[in-house]
């Protein structure tokens, strides 16, 4: 397939510490990214961490989005839960609203909403889950999601702007779905470079089964997601930035 048609950006999940427990070298990562998805207290984060993360993003001119997850701090939002559609809508409103308070205080605009972890995976697989979560997104705010899944369909059906994601540190299965591990596994920088370059240059990915899977993103804006809790995340994001910068320069973006 052909290269993507727009400038690629890098987004990263941030503010995923809790109390005295730290997660990820956020301050070291901020100069390397374009967009931050800030945890909103359900899978990680707390009021003080949210406030500090918003301030740090503002200082680095980073676009800020809400990163709502399932109410499961112990499992870091990576354990599936059964919630009603009403609950899914409500927890989204609650978490996005919490972040909005800190954004308003700092004069920072809410750029988007990007669901976290297993909730993201549930939305990819289940249209009703995707729809319920998206009903909790404020009017006029885009959603980040995986193209070709129920996230894209629900967003389009509800008139929500959809922005596509590729992944720098997550593998895909042969159906083009993400393989979400409870605990992140290390990546070799050479594998990260190959993984990201294939997605940008060919709109495809080599699955865990060795199958080349197309990932058509149409004309959506696109960013590469990396995670601050991945082992070696600093090298992963430096490698991703190298590939992204080379791609954008090559195609004049």
From Swiss-Prot:
It comes from the Eukaryota. InterPro entries: Glyco_hydro/deAcase_b/a-brl, LamB/YcsF/PxpA-like. Coiled coil: none annotated. One of its GO terms (biological process) is carbohydrate metabolic process. Pfam families: LamB_YcsF (PF03746). Induction: By beta-alanine. Signal peptide: none annotated. SUPFAM superfamilies: Glycoside hydrolase/deacetylase. Transmembrane segments: none annotated. Involved in the utilization of lactams. Required for the conversion of exogenous 2-pyrrolidinone (gamma-butyrolactam) to endogenous gamma-amino-n-butyrate (GABA). Belongs to the LamB/PxpA family. This is Lactam utilization protein lamB. The lineage of its organism: Eukaryota, Fungi, Dikarya, Ascomycota, Pezizomycotina.
């Amino acid at each position: 397939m052909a290269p993507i048609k727009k400038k690629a950006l890098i987004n990263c999940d941030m503010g995923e510490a809790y109390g005295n427990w730290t997660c990820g070298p956020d301050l070291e990562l901020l100069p390397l990214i374009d967009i931050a998805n800030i945890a909103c207290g359900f899978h990680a984060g707390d009021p003080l961490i949210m406030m500090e993360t918003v301030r740090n993003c503002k200082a680095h001119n980073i676009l800020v989005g809400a990163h709502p997850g399932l109410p499961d701090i112990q499992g870091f939002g990576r354990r599936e839960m059964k919630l009603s559609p009403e609950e899914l809508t409500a927890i989204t409103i609650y978490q996005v609203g919490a972040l909005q308070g800190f954004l308003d205080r700092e004069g920072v605009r809410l750029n988007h909403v990007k669901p976290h972890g297993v909730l993201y995976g549930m939305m990819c697989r289940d249209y009703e889950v995707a729809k319920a979560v998206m009903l909790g997104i404020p009017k006029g705010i885009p959603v980040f999601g995986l193209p070709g899944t129920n996230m894209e369909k629900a967003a389009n059906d509800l008139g929500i702007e959809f922005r596509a994601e590729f992944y720098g540190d997550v593998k895909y299965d042969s159906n083009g779905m993400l393989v979400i591990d409870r605990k992140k596994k290390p990546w070799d920088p050479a594998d990260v470079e190959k993984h990201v370059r294939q997605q940008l240059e060919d709109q495809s990915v080599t699955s865990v089964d060795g199958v080349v899977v197309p990932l058509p993103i149409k004309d959506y804006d696109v960013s590469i997601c990396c995670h601050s809790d991945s082992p070696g995340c600093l090298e992963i994001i430096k490698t991703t930035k190298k590939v992204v910068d080379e791609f954008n320069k090559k195609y004049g973006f």
